[in-house]
């Protein structure tokens, strides 16, 4: 499974004709894409009032990853490891990464923070 980050969705939604859009369509067609709940919320909050219902229906077809108590414990441990390495990450990225780790999924993002997270062994990246 591939957890698709907000950065990929935004690029795809803004520029329908792109290599990211083609790759995302292929992942969706193969049922290989999943949606971390923070990504879903970011996408819905960024959509216009008119586009939001259609986007919500489209996103509802995807498996959505929700945090558990274990997710929060994993993030708490990562904060210590990252801090010890002189790294800091946003809450949303940590949550997306932890949800991917727990499900054995790869993360596809255009955000360099996930590359840094990968360097610490927190996530494995999908590279199309």
Regions found by a protein language model. Give the residues of each.
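Acidic, PIN/NYN-like endoribonuclease modules and their adjacent C-terminal/linker elements
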Residues: 1, 97, 101-128
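Short, hinge-like loop/turn segments at secondary-structure boundaries
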Residues: 50-54, 82-83, 124-128
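A conserved hydrophobic position in a structured secondary element of the catalytic/binding core
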Residues: 4, 35-36, 67, 109
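General small-molecule cofactor/ligand-binding pocket signal
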Residues: 34, 65, 123-126
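Conserved glycosyltransferase catalytic-site signature
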Residues: 6, 37, 91-94
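Short, well-structured N-terminal submotif of metal-dependent ribonuclease cores
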Residues: 1-35, 44-57
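Active-site neighborhoods of divalent-metal-dependent phosphate/nucleic-acid chemistry enzymes
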Residues: 63-110
């Amino acid at each position: 499974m591939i957890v698709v980050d907000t950065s990929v969705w935004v690029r795809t939604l803004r520029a329908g004709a792109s290599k990211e859009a083609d790759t995302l369509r292929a992942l969706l067609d193969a049922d290989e894409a999943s949606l971390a709940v923070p990504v879903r919320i970011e996408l819905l909050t960024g959509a216009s009032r008119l586009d939001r219902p259609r986007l919500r229906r489209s996103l509802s077809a995807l498996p959505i990853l929700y945090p558990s108590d274990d997710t929060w414990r994993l993030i708490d441990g990562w904060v210590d490891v990252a801090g010890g390495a002189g790294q800091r990450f946003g809450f949303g990225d940590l949550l997306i990464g932890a949800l991917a780790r727990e499900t054995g999924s790869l993360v596809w993002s255009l955000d360099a923070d996930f590359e840094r997270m990968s360097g610490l062994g927190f996530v494995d990246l999908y590279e199309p």
